[in-house]
Amino acid sequence: MKLGIVIFPSKMIQDKANGLRKRYDPHYALVPPHITLKTPFETQDEQLESIVNELHTIASKTNPFALHVGKVGSFAPVNNVLYFKVEKTPELTFLNEEMHSGFFTQEREYAFVPHLTIGQGLSDAEHADVLGRLRMKDFYYEQPIDRFHLLYQLENGTWTVHETFRLGKGNN
């Protein structure tokens, strides 16, 4: 089974991101807008209970925090991906590090850059055009975060929530 670990922003932020994703992200229908804490990984069904237990432990060691989303960025020239930048708080860094050490040890493909994808798979020309237009707009959103989610991928490629983990002691 294929799993991923994410934070879902508020409906207002998701609506703003989806307004752009409809036009610029071919994965729009597969998963709601999110901040990836751990990229998708394959695991055996028998490991699911251990994964869930470890995520409860990580969540209990992490306090709720404020998520700051703003400005448009890009991973070009590595990838023609457009995103809303997410401020790299100590809590986000801690969550990401915990999900790449100990029980979850696995090689990282990229350094951790918290973001909310709004476009991908664009041609170089389209990417440059859209990035230029979006960088002129002023985006800034802030919201409290008190949970993250373990997702699994269905056979049709869509992602759905398996379990939600509330941050802070005594919440799980």
Curated annotation (Swiss-Prot):
It comes from the Bacteria. InterPro entries: 2H_phosphoesterase_YjcG-like, Cyclic_Pdiesterase, YjcG. A motif (HXTX 2) lies at residues 115-118. A motif (HXTX 1) lies at residues 34-37. Keywords: Hydrolase. The active site is at H34, H115. Its EC number is 3.1.-.-. Pfam families: 2_5_RNA_ligase2. Gene3D superfamilies: Cyclic phosphodiesterase (3.90.1140.10). The keyword Hydrolase applies. GO terms for molecular function: hydrolase activity, acting on ester bonds. SUPFAM superfamilies: LigT-like. NCBIfam families: PRK13679.1. Belongs to the 2H phosphoesterase superfamily. YjcG family. PANTHER family: PHOSPHOESTERASE SAOUHSC_00951-RELATED, PHOSPHOESTERASE YJCG-RELATED. This is Putative phosphoesterase BCE_1348. It comes from Bacillus cereus (strain ATCC 10987 / NRS 248).
